[in-house]
Each structure stands twice: as structure tokens, then as C-alpha cells.
């Protein structure tokens, strides 16, 4: 298998596969990702169509979201994110990690809405009362036996951006602890036989986010194939 990565935008459209295109992507792994959707749920139909199009052409498709999907519009906020989870189930998402806005409605709400999720939730650097709050990673095994190792990282800035009452007991590994966490995930997934290591991260990009930005992490941690 070879690996392709795609980013989805609102303009995404998908064409029906023809006899000529069916099977043309056999042997390809396609990773589609969204992030910072912020309740723009109208785009999920396009996401689902694009995933189906790639699959119809023979590709193995992994559809992921890198956080901030349960907040931002009335369409999702009125249900405290439950509507977003329902539509992401229908769109065929495989894995997500968490953004800071996932904590707008509190940890208990996350547990409630994710209980109905048909996709995995990975976040290796989030602790609840000192213990892992979510699964750290997921091994995805493809039809030919190829293994993809995916781990999640949430921004440590959530600790200062979220309402303290909503994240009581929740801590986020940051700086050197964040790097060590990522290194441990790479090691564990490599030892599990994963051919590709994918970090699904919701980390800052601005200067004020240093040293917890994606570029800071990638400068310190080796072995990540896709971020």
C-alpha cells in the first residue's frame, strides 16, 4: 500500500465512479481529515460522498477529525454536541481527537455523547484525576494486514481556555511531558507492528502557543509519518 493524505474543505465534491475509474486506487491508503468544523454540519454530506467515492475506486480510506467539532453553531450547541456526533456517525468517521472547544460543555457531557459515537476517540495527553481520560491510540488494520497506528494529542492550552468548572480534575500533558507522551506512543505503535504512525493532533500554530505547537512537537519527536 502507498499513502495519500487529503484535507477536506467546504468546496469538496465527489463524482460518481465510472467503469474506467473503479479500482484505479486499489493499493492506495487515503487519509481524509477535517478540523475546526465548529458546527458547520452542512458539509458532512460532502465528506461522506468523498469517502464513498474513494472507496468505490478501490482505496482504503481513513476518515478522521482533529477536534473542535461539537461547538460553534446553534445546530450543534443546542444538543451540546450530540447532533455533531450523530452526523459524523452517518458520514463514516473512523477516529477523532479533541479540541479545546470539546470541553465547552464539560467532561460528563463528552462521556455521554461519545457513548453513542461509532468512531474512536483518541487523546493520549489528557488525564482525568491522574488516569487516562480517553484511549491513547488505535491500531487500524487494513484488508491486506497493513497496520496504521493513530494516536491523539489535544492542545494543553485547553487548561487556560476552557471554563475551569468544566474541566475539574482534567489535566493536559504539556511541553516536555507532551513530547515524552508522543515518543511513548510512537514506540508503542511501532512495537505493535504499525507500518505508518499518524498523530491526530489539535495543537496551536501561533507564537503564543509555543512550546506546544505542532512544529515544536515535530522538532522534538521522530517517527511520526503523518500529522
Placement of each model-derived feature along the sequence:
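Sec-dependent N-terminal signal peptides of Gram-positive bacterial secreted proteins and lipoproteins
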Residues: 1-10
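Acidic, metal/ion-coordinating pockets
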Residues: 10-227
